Amino acid sequence: MINTELLLAAWLEKLQKKWDTEEYYYDVEEAKKVFKFVSKLTNDRGASRNFDLLEFQFEIITEILCVKRRSDGKRKHREAHINIPRKNGKSFLAAIIVVYLFFCQRHIFGALFILTANTTKQAGELYGTVEHFIKANKTLRRYCKITSSTKTIIRKDNGNKLMV
């Protein structure tokens, strides 16, 4: 656990130096929440165990979610293009971001999260990863109604809806 904490501290320091400017800041507290949240998710392929994020994965996820404007505290990035080679986890990263936003953004009520991709098969695979993250975590599962046949997930407490 200490190694993980030291690693996280080093990553946070590096990203804070990179993003802290007069106009933007790197929200370290939210980055810690993201790290903790992801560490509670389990892999949907291979051995079903909790994730150990790699540095590049943490950097991509938190640069999208944790870089904010100083003026109003809103995220700098409203859209993101993840450009990494095939079979390096783009869908995995997208699923983490979607699940984090679906569950951890308290000010979002009745939102519609739509998963899209180049093909229906890719969108279905992304949905399958999101669904696995939720079903494998009893805390997340408790807050949702999952309808696999229509590929729809509805939050019971705030009415947010995720669908393909």
Please describe what each predicted stretch is:
Residues 1-164:
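Phosphate/NTP-binding elements of NTP-utilizing enzymes
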